[in-house]
């Protein structure tokens, strides 16, 4: 499988997991499995992965009343992976980013 990692999941809760437990949260492809996720994180960031936990979130159904009647839609399903790293290892998501104002 190609790279299953889509993007880091940066929320208040995931940042707390990173600071307290050394766990990082990623949004991954729906068909990704734990072994593919582990290999992708180790290859991309050069760290040792201790464990991987995954969870599937079903997309919500949305309804909106319009002049033509009720329009229904659905948000996309997502899959997240919680990756635990070895002792003393970190991932820096902002290493390639330039601060505002610098060219």
Swiss-Prot record:
Pfam families: Ribosomal_L23
Domain of life of the source: Bacteria
This protein's GO CC annotations: ribonucleoprotein complex; ribosome
Keywords noted in UniProt: Ribonucleoprotein, Ribosomal protein, RNA-binding, rRNA-binding
GO molecular function terms listed in the Swiss-Prot or TrEMBL record: rRNA binding; structural constituent of ribosome
GO biological processes: translation
Family from the record: Belongs to the universal ribosomal protein uL23 family.
NCBIfam families: PRK05738.2-4 (NF004363)
Function as written in the Swiss-Prot or TrEMBL entry: One of the early assembly proteins it binds 23S rRNA. One of the proteins that surrounds the polypeptide exit tunnel on the outside of the ribosome. Forms the main docking site for trigger factor binding to the ribosome.
Oligomer and partners: Part of the 50S ribosomal subunit. Contacts protein L29, and trigger factor when it is bound to the ribosome.
Name of the protein: Large ribosomal subunit protein uL23
